[in-house]
A protein has these predicted regions:
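Short gly/ser-rich loop at a beta-strand->alpha-helix junction or flexible surface loop bordering the NTP-binding
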Residues: 1-157
């Protein structure tokens, strides 16, 4: 059991979303795919900037080939952090959702599921970009990253 005074107990749950969730979900190898959660809402409290950075560091340790762009996108049900910094952009979503919207990466770290992330991205992408993302998520093809060629018939996320 974790004592309340320990650093682990004081950390808030970090839920990566939007572009950060896509980067994580596409980079993790099949052996490290996150586990579905039964939770139907985002964490009640927004994490601190430090908690978000620590969670990001843990993910990068698990997957050294991953590169997370900045700002990190983090969602919670709270409005305690509703601003954007160079490091983290906080999003708020207080309404419960159906299905499996969150996946566990362990150690108090969550990521939005592929379908949920697609819906989140719909607000910031053009129609063409959204169609490309939909094809990529469904396994039709995977866009190349940093000089890699586009792969067709890729596995769906």
């Amino acid at each position: 059991m974790v004592r309340p005074s320990s650093p682990v107990a004081s950390r808030r749950i970090v839920c990566f979303s939007h572009k950060t969730a896509l980067e994580i979900l596409t980079a993790l190898p099949p052996s490290q795919k996150p586990q579905p959660m039964r939770s139907r809402k985002f964490p009640d409290q927004a994490p601190s900037l430090k908690d978000a950075q620590l969670a990001s560091d843990r993910i990068l340790e698990q997957c050294p080939a991953l590169s997370l762009s900045r700002p990190l996108h983090v969602t919670s049900a709270s409005t305690s952090h509703n601003h954007r910094t160079d490091v983290v952009e906080f999003h708020r979503s207080g309404k419960p959702f159906g299905g499996t919207g969150l996946l566990s990466l362990g150690e108090g770290t969550r990521v939005t599921s592929v379908p949920f992330t697609f819906v989140q991205m719909a607000t910031s992408l053009s129609l063409i970009e959204l169609l490309e993302l939909g094809y990529e998520l469904c396994g039709t093809y995977r866009r190349g990253k940093a000089g890699e060629p586009t792969r067709y018939h890729a596995d769906p996320l």
